[in-house]
Amino acid sequence: MALKARALYSFQGENKEEINILENEELHLFSDVSLDGWLQGTNSRGQTGLFPASYVEILRPRSGSVQVDYSGHTQGYTDSPHQGSYDDDEEDDDDWDDWDDGQTVVDEPSGSNGVSRSQLQHHHHYPRPEYTHRPRPALERQDSIASGKRGSVVGRNLNRFSSFVRSGVEAFVLGDVPQFGGVSESHAIEMGPKGPQWKANPRPFSCSVEEPTKQTKFKGIKSYISYRLTPDPCNSPVYRRYKHFDWLYNRLLHKFTVISVPHLPEKQATGRFEEDFIQKRKRRLVLWMDHMTSHPVLSQYDGFQHFLSCQDEKQWKAGKRRAERDELVGASFLLTLQLPTEHQDLQDVEERVDVFKAFSKKMDENVLQLSSVVSELARKHLGGFRKEFQRLGAALQGLSHSFQLDPPYSSEPLVGAISHTGRTYEAVGEMFAEQPKNDQFRFLDTLSLYQGLLSNFPDIIHLQKGAFAKVKESQRMSDEGRMEQDEADGIRKRCRVVGFALQAEINHFHQRRLQDFKQAIQHYLKEQILFYRRVSQELEKTLHMYDDL
């Protein structure tokens, strides 16, 4: 039975985690337990997010207490890293082919801010309501009071749903993340010519994604597409479904809080077995795999290596559980980082982060604009250009037919040449319609990948900004005699870890950006040259038909 509430007052959300509610509006709650004075639920417009608990009245059944089942709402606030979740071929089944022998041990992440972007970013157009001003609720402070631990003297962030808090990075900076004895996993950051960078993978490799094949099970009741993955240099192929990629992607999000994990290509509810969609997803999985194998940290992740190599059912299940029970995830992953000895002034790091923040915002805007322009051009190739050239060809052939109506004055060679010209332009129209798959679609694949990568950085940068704020607060408290200098130095040291990790990720992003956009635009230009050369050759052949008239 769904848990419902009624809004006592109107509330206007002030950030992407909060939603608007109207007085007397009926709301659906995920739980009646408030977190620091906030509830999470869905309004009547389908928007999911947070609103003040004091602004609503929970509607409880009159007849006794009823056990409320929240399982139906789990998807409402579990992160969906790519839009659409109705892909029938992605449903969980029981057998080894699905690699799913039970529920996932570790809860899936909800993105860095705890609420699914796809749930928060609805594009409904409703008239803006009039809101009655009411002070925002006072948040409960029990978790902000200094505990007996020395590392928790600095006040905690009151917004318990910010990415800085939910990721655990706040707890790490304050020294509240427990140390693990005998940590075997480690990732080194070294100083390069342009600042901190991830140490290269000592065993670099690549992996091809090939042969998307439709397969069936349960005597044809279930259908799905599998892909052949062949890591190089081992050259031992494995076959994976999209849902297996999805499982891996969620493990990556759960573990690597400070790394921009490339987004998977989107799911699709209908038409997923159509050839165009299959090829599009394959192209984008190729790019995704290329970014994964080229990343010095992601490529060495045990879960990724297991995904690429395991072929045995029992071994897979053991490795799957191992990945899901990994304790070095989120903020604990920061414990695995080995930093260089070089000193970096935190103010310089903050300025560097601000520069990248402005850069990534501008690049994101321009990638979106370029993607829109290229998409429109591709649509014209498929529709408008093709249609116009076919109209031109038909008109020329109509002219040639009219020349035959007065036989004594008709010129067969000229009629034939004009008719051939018409057919040539019709063929050119078909060439325009076929061209996007050679250049524009591939360019759009790269732009889509970078839209995903860039969309990760605001939350990652927010982690660093939160760490900077804790350093400044701790230093102020130390100067006022309210904190030992050793404690403030510890916070500064842990902030340095976050700063080095972010700079290393920025460095890797720029390296890949330079390489990817060089290759993408080179490929686009080469294909455009070949295309117009073929068009030119067809027109030249037609032109020569007029030479001897």
Swiss-Prot record:
Location comes to: Cytoplasm, Cytosol; Membrane; Cytoplasmic vesicle membrane
Supply the alphabetized keyword list. Answer: Cell cycle, Cell division, Cytoplasm, Cytoplasmic vesicle, Endocytosis, Membrane, Mitosis, Protein transport, SH3 domain, Transport
Q: Provide the leader sequence positions.
A: none
User: Which InterPro entries does UniProt cross-reference here?
Assistant: AH/BAR_dom_sf (IPR027267), PX_dom (IPR001683), PX_dom_sf (IPR036871), SH3-like_dom_sf (IPR036028), SH3_domain (IPR001452), Snx9_fam (IPR014536), Sorting_nexin_WASP-bd-dom (IPR019497)
Q: Composition bias, kind Polar residues: at what positions?
A: 66-83, 110-119
Q: What is known of its domains?
A: The PX and BAR domains mediate association with membranes and are required for membrane tubulation.
The UniProt entry's sequence similarity note says: Belongs to the sorting nexin family.
Please state what the protein is called: Sorting nexin-33
